[in-house]
Structures are given as structure tokens and as C-alpha cells.
Design a protein with these regions (language model features):
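N-terminal pre-catalytic "stem/leader" segment of glycosyltransferase-like enzymes
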Residues: 1-44
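Short hydrophobic segments within beta-strands
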Residues: 4-6, 63, 116
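Short, well-ordered alpha-helix to beta-strand connector turns
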Residues: 31, 42-46, 58, 88-90, ...
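Active-site proximal beta-strand in glycosyltransferases
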Residues: 46-73
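Short beta-strand scaffold positions
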Residues: 49, 94-95, 115
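Membrane-proximal helix-turn-helix segments that form the acceptor-binding/catalytic region
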Residues: 75-92
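Carbohydrate-associated surface elements
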Residues: 98, 116-119
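Acidic anion/phosphate-binding donor-loop and adjacent secondary structure
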Residues: 104, 119-121
Length: 121
């Protein structure tokens, strides 16, 4: 399977990027073609987006590890691109049950949701 990892930096050690790198390494061991970009004409089978979907032209799995809810910030504006990605996703993977409940409270429920914690080792 050809998998596009969207909105990720494999060289970063931050939370979502670190998780993405471990997941990529595991998928590569299973002989999947995993990249953060594909050349024109090379069509991935699915996109795995981290927090925000930047490539909405193919089937998409969105991995969410949180949303903004701090009332001292304009959390509605900060959440808007996340909310749009959440609603458009074919499947959503949450980092935790807390994250799922918080997201559903602010954005509503969608179909095809799963919880996969960070322990991917």
C-alpha cells in the first residue's frame, strides 16, 4: 500500500512527529510504501494526516492528539482548520479517550473513529 504521511516532519522529535516516525518505521517493515511526498502521477492509496489534512484529494485517515480549548485564546479560530479536517476525514484516530470526548464535545461526532494511544512500540 502507498501511504502519504501528511503534515509531518520525520526529522522532528515533537509528539505527533515522533509518533509518526515510529508508525512509518513499523509500516515500512511490513513492506508498505510510506512517504511524506509523492511525485506527480504517483498516486498514494491513502493519506494519513496529522492534526490537519493538507491534501484532501484522496481517502484520508486523520490522527488527532488534541484540540484547542483554552478560553484565554481564540480557540474557535485556532480549531477551525482542525474541525474542517475532522469533518472531511474518512476515518479519525484519536490519541486518547479524553481527546475523543473533547473533540466530539466541540465538533460533534463522526463515523469511523478509533483510539490508538502513543504506545506503538
Amino acid at each position: 500500500m502507498r501511504i502519504l504521511f501528511d503534515n509531518i516532519n520525520f526529522n522532528s522529535r515533537s509528539g505527533p512527529n515522533s509518533f509518526g516516525k515510529k508508525l512509518r518505521d513499523g509500516l515500512l517493515k511490513l513492506d508498505h510504501d510510506v512517504r511524506d511526498s509523492f511525485a506527480t502521477g504517483e498516486n498514494p492509496d491513502v493519506s494519513l494526516s496529522f492534526i490537519i489534512n493538507q491534501k484532501p484529494t484522496m481517502p484520508n485517515v486523520l490522527r488527532l492528539d488534541g484540540i484547542y480549548f483554552n478560553t484565554s485564546q481564540d480557540f474557535n479560530a485556532l480549531n477551525d482548520p482542525i474541525r474542517r479536517s475532522y469533518i472531511a476525514a474518512d476515518t479519525v484516530v484519536f490519541q486518547s479517550k479524553f481527546n475523543q470526548h473533547l473533540t466530539e464535545r466541540y465538533f460533534g461526532s463522526v463515523e469511523n473513529t478509533y483510539i490508538i494511544g502513543n504506545g506503538v512500540d
